[in-house]
Amino acid sequence: MKVKKYDQFNESVYQAKLANGLTVTMLPKTGYHKTYATLTTNYGSIDNTFVPAGSTELQRFPDGIAHFLEHKMFEKADHDAFQIFGQYGASANAFTSFTKTSYLLSATRHLKENLTTLLDFVQDPYFSTATVEKEKGIIGQEIEMYDDDPSWRLYFGMIGNLYPNHPLQYDIAGTTDSIAKITADDLYAAYRTFYHPENMTLFVVGNFDPDEVLALVKANQDAKDFTAFQPIERKIPETAADGHDIIPYRTIDMPVNRAKSIVGVKGLVPIESGAAALKYRAAVNVLLELLFGDTSADYLRLYDQGIIDDTFGYDFELQNGFNFVTFSGETDDPAQFDTAIIDVLENWRRSVVDQDDALALVKKEMIGRVVFMANSLEAVANRYDQRLFGTATIFDEPAVIDSLTLDDLTAVAEQLLQSQAISEYQIRPQAKN
């Protein structure tokens, strides 16, 4: 078992890779009553074309299958995993993102029983035609609910602009038509391909002894038989390096009282995983704070002019294989909103060049936020992404942020904020009859 010490935080992270390939990462934290765990597979909504385990041919699976599989994992032939967690006083949940699926556990007692339940229910799938058909109705209602959500439509409308030929454009849950095609055999094929321990990580943080937890997990895994791991072959379409495939502008009408607008910027340069990805994320976040933080000159100017208001916000998405930034808000004049945001992006140098004092202040604020998040077990676990950031944890982030210079931000801005990578998407109020 490897140990990585963070003396400045008085924390130690323990990691081991088991014989079956499962990576176990543990962060014991004394003084906490709760323990939080995530069991994650590197399988998300964009992984809809792959070679199923045991096969040699690429196969296209219905959109939404990763999310559908996540929903069905809790249900077994004669019980529901939630019932067992409830018996041991634990809460459980799961989520599917573009690139991964995670199963979450939170408990203040019975850690042995709850960790065992987490491992066992995820590693023992049960799908039948009847239960799959029943789930289609449940997920279909969820999809329809999101289809009626203007904020959701705005966000995925922008993704569709930035990635029109990429599975990113599809809702993580799929569509009612796509999930109607999912079969139990499809779920088993996806499960066998992506839910092998070699493609999964277990992260445990909270009040426990790492030697005891590792022994528990090892014994649990040694008692199970797994087929040999077949390296995963995915087919993810390439996107244009010069951004020529980006849709520059779209608008739709919806029953909203006030227009919504979003400006997006697609990262055109691939980002290497590991330390480079961690630094890139930190640099982009600092850059965005300099440009649009609520004390920045441009933010205050646009706010005073009434171009943006308290509904304004920005988001940076960095996952394995893609990254993009969005700026959105409600507005009475979508064209004016978009023009103002794009002006700030294209004239980023006025917020970066010679702004040493502003940089120092933003870095201090961001380090403070990270240190604060490090006290949250959920934040520590959910920010861990071995596939993207390697062995780095939240405790590596302050040093990375502190090391950033204006030259670093200039390099990132020149790389990311390219005019040909910008797109606009608007939702306007429907005309009243």
What spans do the regions from the language model cover?
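Charge-rich, well-structured scaffold segments of protease-associated domains
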Residues: 17, 80-234, 274, 279, ...
